[in-house]
């Protein structure tokens, strides 16, 4: 049996551009792609914290250090500049692989620069 587990996450990034007439995708600062291990053209899920929209697209590289988070094409209709989003990628793996797998979790500041990273999410308490 194979499981689908969270591979990588960019947490609470700020949308910098919304380009309806650009070829569809999300352009992500290259430093964030490197930190997460998300590959160019990999499917990603976008969860808009601001408006609740959830959709999928694919990642393309934006200039390193630019802070760009640009939703393009049809995806641009789901967000507005300034919205907070979570970008997530998943990987399929065996149960044995899943036992030791740790996701790459990247947390960013208001300018989409890396504030810190982690490989686990704290247990939620009541």
Swiss-Prot record:
Protein name as annotated: Aspartate 1-decarboxylase
Active site: residue positions: 25, 58
Any matching Pfam family: Asp_decarbox
Family: Belongs to the PanD family.
Residue positions binding substrate: 57, 73-75
GO biological process, one term: alanine biosynthetic process
Reactions that this protein is recorded to catalyse: L-aspartate + H(+) = beta-alanine + CO2
Entry's localization field: Cytoplasm
Any one GO molecular function term: aspartate 1-decarboxylase activity
Pathway(s) per entry: Cofactor biosynthesis; (R)-pantothenate biosynthesis; beta-alanine from L-aspartate: step 1/1
Keyword terms, alphabetized: Autocatalytic cleavage, Cytoplasm, Decarboxylase, Lyase, Pantothenate biosynthesis, Pyruvate, Schiff base, Zymogen
Maturation and modification: Is synthesized initially as an inactive proenzyme, which is activated by self-cleavage at a specific serine bond to produce a beta-subunit with a hydroxyl group at its C-terminus and an alpha-subunit with a pyruvoyl group at its N-terminus.
Disulfide linkage: none
Lyase among keywords: yes
EC number assigned by the record: 4.1.1.11
Cofactor info, note text: Binds 1 pyruvoyl group covalently per subunit.
Name of the top EC class for this enzyme: lyase
Cofactors required: pyruvate
Chain positions found as Pyruvic acid (Ser): 25
Gene Ontology cellular component terms for the protein in this record: cytosol
Reported function: Catalyzes the pyruvoyl-dependent decarboxylation of aspartate to produce beta-alanine.
Quaternary state and interactors: Heterooctamer of four alpha and four beta subunits.
NCBIfam families: panD (TIGR00223)
């Amino acid at each position: 049996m194979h499981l689908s587990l969270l591979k990588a996450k960019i947490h609470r990034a700020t949308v910098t551009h919304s380009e309806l007439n650009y070829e569809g995708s999300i352009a992500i600062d290259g430093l964030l792609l490197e930190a997460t291990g998300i590959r160019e053209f990999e499917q990603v899920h976008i969860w808009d914290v601001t408006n609740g929209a959830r959709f999928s697209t694919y990642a393309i590289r934006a200039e390193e250090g630019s802070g760009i988070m640009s939703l393009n094409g049809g995806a641009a209709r789901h967000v507005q500049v300034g919205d907070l989003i979570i970008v997530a990628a998943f990987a399929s793996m065996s149960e044995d692989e899943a036992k030791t797998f740790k996701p790459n979790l990247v947390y960013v500041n208001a300018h989409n620069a890396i504030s810190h990273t982690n490989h686990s999410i704290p247990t939620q308490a009541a």
